[in-house]
From Swiss-Prot:
Record-annotated disulphide pairs: none
Protein name: Uncharacterized protein ORF209
Domain MPN, chain residue ranges per copy: 1-67
Residue positions of motif JAMM motif: 17-30
InterPro entries from the UniProt entry: JAB_dom_prok, MPN
Top-level taxon: Viruses
Xref: Pfam families: Prok-JAB (PF14464)
Membrane spanning residue stretches: none
A GO MF term: metal ion binding
Residues that hold Zn(2+) according to the record: 17, 19, 30
GO biological process, alphabetically ordered: proteolysis
């Protein structure tokens, strides 16, 4: 099994993140007021870091529901000639999530931009095979970062592969599904197949962290 390279955005226009929660259709003005937008092209912006009433806010969009062509057109209009879209114009993005971040370290953007890094950051594996919110467990964070592959299959579910290496050993695979404040893991045994790996390689959001 080939270990996929870690995603590194080529261009930073604003800061991005993904998360399948929150209100729908944030305004294009959220983008225009942003300090940073992280993207590899104008069609794949996932979210912004903005300031509102003196507080830093991370506005995270779901990758799968962005209207890429409309977003590209709106951004081009603004970035190329400074024309600001009307306030009522909305991005057709489902599941935006807004959170205040007091001490956000911009230098960590490449880490956070990785889709699996998002899951690592908000949940960890504990002894009961659950992902539970707790970003403070550095040991598990590092272990997942070194030996895990996340394959998204929908807005709130995907495959989690542990023990990925080049030795040919059978990987440990879980089907992951978000459920309110935690993510349940169900071992899939031999359900994992090379077909999934090949499919994964073609997806921009699928990578080893």
């Amino acid at each position: 099994m080939e270990i996929l390279p870690k995603y590194k955005p080529e261009e930073i226009l604003a800061i991005i993140h993904t998360h399948p929660k929150g209100p729908a259709e944030p305004s294009i003005n959220d983008l225009l007021m942003a300090r940073h937008v992280l993207t590899n092209n104008k069609n794949t912006i996932h979210g912004v870091l903005a300031e509102n009433d003196g507080k830093l806010q991370l506005i995270m969009y779901n990758y799968w529901t962005i209207d890429g062509s409309k977003l590209a057109k709106m951004l081009s209009r603004f970035l190329d000639n400074g024309v600001k879209p009307p306030r009522e114009e909305k991005l057709k993005v489902a599941h935006a999530y807004v959170t205040n971040i007091e001490d956000f370290d911009v230098s960590k953007i490449p880490e956070i931009a990785d889709h699996f890094a998002l899951w690592r950051y908000y949940w960890l594996i504990d002894t009961s095979d659950l992902f539970v919110f707790d970003p403070s467990n550095i040991d598990i964070y590092k272990k997942l970062k070194e030996k895990a592959l996340f394959i998204p299959t929908g807005r709130d579910e995907g495959w989690l592969v542990l023990g990925v290496d080049t030795s040919g050993a059978e990987p440990i695979v879980y089907k992951v599904k978000e459920c309110k404040d935690k993510v349940t893991l169900r071992s899939t045994g031999h359900e994992f197949s090379p077909i999934i790996v090949e499919w994964c390689k073609e997806k921009p959001m699928c990578r080893v962290a």
